[in-house]
Amino acid sequence: MSLFGSANFGLPRLKPLPSKRSHVVSVLDIGSTKVVCMIGRLTPRAESQILPGRTHSIEVIGIGHQKSRGVKNGVIADLDAVESVVRLAVDAAERMAGLTIDSLIVNVSAGRLQSDVYTATIDLGGQEVEANDLKKVLAAAGHQSLRTDRAILHSLPTGFSLDGERGIRDPLAMFGDVLGVDMHVLTAERPALKNLELCVNRAHLSVEGMVATPYASGLAALVDDEVELGCAAIDMGGGTTTISVFAEGKLVHADAVGLGGHHVTTDLARGLSTRIEDAERLKVVHGSALPNSADERDIISVPPIGEDDRDQPTHVPRALVSRIVRARIEETLELIRDRIQRSGFSPIVGKRIVLTGGASQLTGLPEAARRILARNVRIGRPLGVSGLPAAAKGPAFSTAVGLMIYPQVADLETHAAGSGMFSTLGGNSRFARMGQWLKESF
């Protein structure tokens, strides 16, 4: 059955994880440069003291990854090609895990991700805040976000207010005259999500849930204090670069730009008249986001385009490669800087930026990012999982690992049911347990 019913504004939320037994989760990261399938076992443990909902440890028991085909800038461009790659990646993960899967959690980079904050208030008349009051104010905020052309990926209450006093995390049982809520809603265009689901269905698999790429990569790459105090995670992929801003343990903003590492590769291929695969090798081996005086003296050979082995390679200074790389990297970083500034969340981000994704491994990128973004920058690798092979411990696998973390925090969200009313799924926090009661009682 499709996730997209005719009356559904939001995607169905994942079922709560079992609290007393282990559970197997399978995920699929469909990117412009690679497709990754991971299978993991989630085992209950003591809940994190800082990050809400982190109740399970994760062990990767199967992984498969393939070079991507049929995806351009995060958008499905060739259904047959994507289906073939998905089959190969899933098969490799199943063989390693020794089991067969039938559903997956999938990432979303396409669909023009849009992040909005909606505010709503209701009158309490000086009475105590009850569970039904929370339901009403969440529904009032949620109704503002409903659009027929877009599907809700994530909807998180980022904070409540009482009588204008903001920053209240859990107002249940408190007294006041006016109860308010700020709701962060992340949406994507429905056709892009339908095409993504279609690719997975054609591989005889179903989509269990969809997670925005910036949310997933942030879950994997940020440490507790960064998520609590405020930080931005920049996931530099092959075809897209995504931005996620976290504060007080929650995702408060997300964005995406259609530039990534593959654009650097194509710039090199055009500028040096060489094949894409040779340009990729030149980028990895010789490319740098920083100028170096020695680059003018170092000469490198560039294989020409063509099938004639007798064609002689051209020789260029390494500085030319770096100049081409640097121009595109600086353009991307400047665009990220402007997006963060325009979002209004720049003060929340403060001085903390974490770079992750495959393109973040380019030589000199952290230094270039510090200069252009004017913030402290570190490279973020996937955290919080065991069993990852050495080849999958780098920034390129942050999104896939974040997809495995997501089921633990999915119950922090509210979502639009078929009727358009917002409901809350259960979990282990006080607010989530209240949500489970709401779900069962109304």
From Swiss-Prot:
One of its GO terms (cellular component) is cell division site. InterPro entries: ATPase_NBD, Cell_div_FtsA, FtsA/MreB, SHS2_FtsA. Keywords: Cell cycle, Cell division, Cell inner membrane, Cell membrane, Membrane. It holds the Pfam family FtsA. It is a peripheral membrane protein. The keyword Methyltransferase does not apply. GO terms for biological process: FtsZ-dependent cytokinesis. It is found in: Cell inner membrane. It comes from the Bacteria. Belongs to the FtsA/MreB family. Self-interacts. Interacts with FtsZ. Cell division protein that is involved in the assembly of the Z ring. May serve as a membrane anchor for the Z ring. This is Cell division protein FtsA. It comes from Rhizobium meliloti (strain 1021) (Ensifer meliloti).
